[in-house]
Amino acid sequence: MPRTVLALGLASALGFGALASPGFANAEDRPLTAIGDVQRGTMVMVAGTVDRMLDEDEFRLRDETGTLRVYVGPNWVPVDVGEAVTVFGYMDDALIRPELYAREITRADGTVVTLSQRYE
């Protein structure tokens, strides 16, 4: 048990927050959440279609249960409108305009885009 805690702490300290969460060691272990069921303040994985670009670093994702703002900054949006994607990241806890802070985007062709810069 102490080794697990040490490893998780080290992963977190090195900026691998997604890897620091038990149960999220790889993409296959991450449960898919419907956009309408996303809870604030949690790590989530959602899938949908890019509905529209909101800014150079933000887009709206849509599934059959709703829409969600996805923030990729300070990176450029690496997807296109109409593209089916899966996004893993942190859902902030803002009451007004909550956003999913993307850490990883998987495109329909299987390409994984890891967003290496953290958010400010």
Where is each model-derived feature located?
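Bacterial N-terminal signal peptides that target proteins for export
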Residues: 1-9
